[in-house]
A protein has these predicted regions:
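C-terminal motif of bacterial Sec signal peptides marking the signal peptidase cleavage site
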Residues: 13-16
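Short, compositionally biased P/S/T/A/G/V-rich stretches that sit at domain boundaries
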Residues: 20-49, 135-158
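Short coil/turn motif common to extracellular beta-sandwich-like domains
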Residues: 47-55, 65-72, 158-167
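Short, well-structured beta-strand segments within conserved domains
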Residues: 52, 56, 108-118, 168, ...
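Solvent-exposed loop/turn segments flanking beta-strands in beta-repeat/beta-sandwich domains
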Residues: 61-83, 171-184
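Short acidic/polar inter-strand loop motif in beta-rich domains
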Residues: 63, 93, 117-126, 191, ...
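Short beta-strand segments within Ig-like beta-sandwich modules, predominantly Fibronectin type-III
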Residues: 91-98, 188-196
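Surface-exposed interaction/gating patches
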Residues: 144-181, 191-194
Length: 237
């Protein structure tokens, strides 16, 4: 009986240790910068099936190519290569590996962000690497401060659960220790981010993980801007 109780206590202790693993957030280093990469809108047309056809001009960036340091950073990677992240009203992005594609849009207003993404889904962060536009009633001021959520997204399995990319896109704003900041809440663990850069999460528990990103001012107050805050749930199996 004592042996059984000891075994149960051992199992409970191990389970408790596994569940209490510390969540950490670290800056991702070493990605190719693609300082001259550029995307611009070539055309947006509405076809007979009520689908919008988007065409983008992309230069100094190869869609479909594998980003050079994919293996080294150990992040979930798309086998189809580099692509465009296409976000509507700060919803989950769709990935596009060519510069021409079609999308169905809501009848209401659609704020659209398209930016260049490395094959492991890290955004290219330069002033020419994104397009921001809107289609519809045009109620949103595109000069507002924006934080768009990008990663993590969806379900992660196996080794991909060990290291998750945290990435977001800032437009018309900057963050710094003295100014605006991004507050990231991962389950119940909070981080204050003062540099716009890619980050990775480690120590996440299996199951559902809730991620909340908030653009806040120097006083830590939520900035009144479209799509702020951003909340997502991802699953680790």
């Amino acid at each position: 009986m004592k042996k059984i109780l000891a075994l149960i206590l051992f199992i409970v202790t191990i389970s408790s240790c596994n569940n209490s693993k510390k969540i950490t957030l670290s800056k991702l280093e070493g990605s190719p910068p693609y300082l001259n990469a550029k995307i611009s809108t070539a055309s947006i047309t509405l076809d007979d099936d009520n689908e919008y056809a988007f065409s983008f001009d992309v230069s100094d960036y190869e869609l479909g190519a594998k980003t050079i340091n994919t293996v080294e950073n150990q992040l979930a990677n798309s086998g189809k290569g580099q692509h465009i992240h296409f976000i509507i009203n700060n919803g989950p992005y769709s990935a596009h590996y060519t510069n021409n594609f079609k999308k169905k849009l809501n009848k209401d207003n659609n704020v659209i962000l398209a930016f260049l993404s490395r094959s492991y889904h890290e955004s290219v962060k330069n002033q020419n690497a994104f397009v921001l536009t809107q289609i519809g009633e045009e109620k949103v001021d595109l000069n507002s401060e924006f934080l768009f959520y990008s990663r993590p997204k969806g379900t992660y399995k196996g080794k991909d659960t060990e290291k998750l990319l945290l990435d977001f896109y800032l437009i018309n704003t900057t963050i710094s220790p003295e100014g605006n900041k991004v507050k990231a809440t991962i389950n119940d663990t909070e981080f204050i981010i003062t540099e716009w850069a890619p980050y990775y999460l480690q120590g996440l528990p299996k199951g559902n993980v809730k991620i909340k990103l908030e653009l806040v001012n120097s006083e830590g107050e939520l900035i009144d801007s479209p799509f702020n805050p951003s909340i997502r749930n991802v699953t680790l199996e």
